[in-house]
From Swiss-Prot:
Keywords: Cell shape, Cell wall biogenesis/degradation, Isomerase, Peptidoglycan synthesis. GO terms for biological process: cell wall organization; peptidoglycan biosynthetic process; regulation of cell shape. Gene3D superfamilies: 3.40.50.1860. The active site is at C73 (proton donor/acceptor), C186 (proton donor/acceptor). It catalyses: L-glutamate = D-glutamate. It comes from the Bacteria. It comes from Beutenbergia cavernae (strain ATCC BAA-8 / DSM 12333 / CCUG 43141 / JCM 11478 / NBRC 16432 / NCIMB 13614 / HKI 0122). GO terms for molecular function: glutamate racemase activity. Belongs to the aspartate/glutamate racemases family. Pathway: Cell wall biogenesis; peptidoglycan biosynthesis. This is Glutamate racemase. Provides the (R)-glutamate required for cell wall biosynthesis.
Length: 292
């Protein structure tokens, strides 16, 4: 089981920031990534629908034989983390999410105790970050939904006048509130870090959950004795196998590949079309087990 891939799921391309951190910190592990690009963004959708879509993808990943799940989507984590853990961990598949790792880093980074959190409407309305920060009541939390950010990233627009205008509209109130640490509460948002940092100013620390989440993945694999050995498994011919990565999109694979190559590099040689889209509900048609 330790040679099985780590399953990583996001509503689109944003979770690739987490996948990149996992590849960097766990270079001997295999990754199987699914981006639900056919139904992105999740943020404006009802929580029940986000839960339904998320569990559908996670069920497919578990059926494909992944050894652990990473919910690399704040909206999904906020909507169904407890459901996912109840559904899969009893069968030996641990679940890692992205909210508490970001909270941990932000609490350590702040100097004045004023922390901003930006995310999708679904994430912000869920109050998941308020709940996660409840253990540190001395911190002052300022949250703000930034619904246009995900669509900008999914459209490949990560700089330029439209991005800067949206950043000012969403972030000026947080800057004026004096936050010194800003949690990027959506895994798409690091792709807009240039504009976000420009608007917030040099004195504000931007916190992405990617690196902390990758550390949690490592800790989880160690705790469950699932860490892949550095020299890999032996095949029938006695040779050691290298890690194998596969990235799937439920929408247009070509568009996904273009965006993915911007920050994953050579790991994305191909993106397979994971599903046949029929209206709003895709049906998995390609086996998720495989190589890149």
């Amino acid at each position: 089981m330790s040679d099985a891939p780590i399953g990583i799921f996001d509503s689109g391309v944003g979770g690739l920031t987490v996948a990149r951190a996992v590849l960097d910190q766990l270079p001997h592990e295999s990754v199987l990534y699914v981006g639900d690009t056919a139904r992105t963004p999740y943020g404006p959708r009802p929580i029940a629908q986000v839960r339904e879509y998320s569990l559908e993808i996670l069920d497919s990943l578990v059926a494909s034989g992944v050894k652990a799940l990473v919910i690399a989507c704040n909206s999904a984590s906020a909507a169904m983390l407890a459901d996912a853990r109840e559904r899969y961990e009893g069968d030996g598949v641990p679940v890692v999410e992205v909210i508490r790792p970001a909270v941990r880093r932000a609490a350590a980074a702040t100097r004045n105790g004023r922390i901003g959190v930006i995310g999708t409407r679904a994430t912000i309305s869920s109050r998941a970050y308020e709940d996660a920060f409840a253990a540190a009541p001395q911190l002052q939390l300022h949250t703000r939904a930034c619904p246009d950010f995900v669509e900008l990233v999914e459209d490949g627009e990560t700089s330029g006048p439209a991005v800067l205008a949206s950043a000012h509209a969403y972030l000026d109130p947080l800057r004026d509130a004096g936050v010194d640490t800003l949690v990027l509460g959506c895994t798409h948002y690091p792709l807009l870090a240039g504009a976000i940092s420009y608007v917030m100013g040099e004195g504000v620390t931007l916190v992405s959950s990617a690196e902390e989440t990758a550390l949690d993945v490592y800790r989880t694999l160690v705790a469950h004795d699932l860490l892949r050995s550095a020299d890999g498994a032996r095949g029938d011919d006695g040779a050691r196998s290298a890690p194998r990565h596969r990235f799937l999109a439920t929408g247009d694979p070509a568009a996904f590949t273009r965006l993915a190559r911007r920050f994953l590099g050579p790991e994305v040689d191909d993106v397979h079309d994971a599903v046949e889209v029929t209206g709003e509900i895709p049906r998995i048609t390609a086996p998720l087990r495989g190589t890149r």
